[in-house]
Amino acid sequence: MKLTYILLIAVVGVAIEAKSVKKSKAHHKKKRHETLADNYKLNRIKDSDCKDVADDCKAFGKLEKDDENSCFNNPDKARNECPVSCKLCVSKRSKKQSDYMGGYDLQPQQCSQQSCYETPQWSVQNCAVTCQLCQPGVSSGPVDQDVRCPFWGQYGYCSQQQQQQQTDGYISNNCPFSCNTYGSAQPAQQPYPYPIEALSPYQPNAMPTPPQGVTPAPLPPYFQQQGYGYPQQPQPTQPVQPGQTQAPTAAQSTPAPVQTTPASGKTTTEAAEETTTEAAAEGAETTAAPAATQAPAAAGQEGQQPAAGGQEPQEAQEQEGQQPGTEPAQSDKSNKKKHKKDKAQKKSKSHKKQH
């Protein structure tokens, strides 16, 4: 009985201790790390207050977003000490940017699809081509002043009459390039939600939501090569300088095989087969001595008949006379031997008569 009471007390004590530990953990729960996405409306720093005051702002602003020491993960320092380097100014322009008319990106290495909506004001001034706010290479053309302009133009919000009345012409006034480029788009059935608020740096869900069942207008030709999204500025082709050798193309470096044809009109394979056949025939004639002796006479009698392989008789005889061990050479040797034999027989007969 006492053992039961002791076990019951122990169980109750363990339960109370576990509950107290749980409350303690909940009370001392670590606060979530704050980023520039939190309280994003504070990221729009006025031009009069937008200046860097820390010495390491340039290096601080170049850190990647995922870096724990970046602007995104250190919002207090980004807003208070380095708003210029962290791209939080409303419309901060440098002297170089003040003359900017469009047609190219001022900071192409920092421009990307992601930057168009993470840092919208900075991207309008520095990434007009990447964000599709102007025509590439046309510096005197119109330039959009809102990164949402391509979306509004493709989905027909430029030509929506009710849209112009409700928004006081915000879209048409701020999107001259997109409204002109996508002028053939079907008008939107409903106006864009009003009021249209200005985007803030690192604002979550800054990309507008496409209306259901609506097909956007096609991209212009100078953006189609890069696919849907934000194209990169095409690199111009470098001309070949005098004295330099241009790298060969695939067609130039690999010439097509050429089949050689002899003068007789036959292919190389057929000519080789005929040469082999003629060599075998000549070898057979060399071993046959009686046939070799009669060959010159036969060749003389049949001088008008064409030689094998389509050659003329004279050409065949010339070829036979040039090769060593042929029939004329063998007949000369046999004639000399016969002449010596006859001479020896005459000498022996004359010697017998003298005796």
Curated annotation (Swiss-Prot):
Query: Region (Disordered) spans which residues?
Result: 202-355
Compositional bias (Basic residues) at which positions?
A: 335-355
Main site of residence?
Answer: other
Asked if Signal is a keyword of the record, the answer is: yes
ShKT domain: residues covered: 50-89, 107-134, 140-182
Question: Where would you find this protein in the cell?
Answer: Nematocyst; Secreted
Q: Which residues cross the membrane?
A: none
Q: Which UniProt keywords apply?
A: Cleavage on pair of basic residues, Disulfide bond, Nematocyst, Neurotoxin, Secreted, Signal, Toxin
Q: Which family does it belong to?
A: Belongs to the NEP3 family.
Signal peptide feature range: 1-18
**GO CC terms in record:** extracellular region; nematocyst
Q: Which organism's genome codes for this protein?
A: Nematostella vectensis
The GO terms describing molecular function are: toxin activity
Q: Does the keyword Protein biosynthesis apply?
A: no
Q: In which tissues is it expressed?
A: Nematocytes. In late planulae, transcripts are found throughout the ectoderm in nematocytes, with high concentration of expressing cells in the oral pole. In primary polyps, is expressed in nematocytes in the body wall and physa ectoderm and in the upper and lower pharynx.
Superkingdom, taxonomy of origin: Eukaryota
What are the residue ranges of the propeptide?
A: 92-355
Explain the purpose of this protein.
Neurotoxin. In vivo, induces pronounced contraction and tail twitching on zebrafish larvae, as well as death 5 hours later.
Q: What InterPro entries does this protein's entry cite?
A: ShKT_dom
Write out the biased-composition intervals (Low complexity).
222-232, 240-270, 277-332
**Which pairs of Cys residues are joined through disulfide bonds in the record?**
C50-C89, C57-C82, C71-C86, C116-C131, C149-C175, C158-C179
What is the name of the protein in this document? Nematocyst expressed protein 3
